[in-house]
């Protein structure tokens, strides 16, 4: 049952992140957000989550932040639900 709720919650978050928010209820730069339909960031901002459902609206997401799409990331790449950091990725590959 726990997995069911997790899947439903993931779907809700995904759908809410896909919609273009134009309403007056959206959050502006550096305001609190949750990456849900309840407190979304205004376009083209993205919610940088620090904990579950708690973050700040940013122009783009730095490496390591939770993402759905590559256009949310400053690097332009969202891989496995995280924004990549090209410099850190190169350093990690060289030191492995």
From Swiss-Prot:
Statement: the UniProt record of this protein carries the keyword Ribosomal protein: no
InterPro entries given in the database record: UPF0506
Localization (cell): Secreted
Domain of life: Eukaryota
UniProt keyword annotation of Signal present: yes
Any Gene Ontology CC annotation: extracellular region
Coiled coil: none
UniProt signal peptide: 1-23
Pfam families, per the entry: UPF0506 (PF11703)
Keywords from the UniProt entry: Disulfide bond, Knottin, Secreted, Signal
Disulfide bonds: 60-74, 67-78, 73-83
Notes concerning its domains: The presence of a 'disulfide through disulfide knot' structurally defines this protein as a knottin.
Protein name: Uncharacterized protein SJCHGC09766
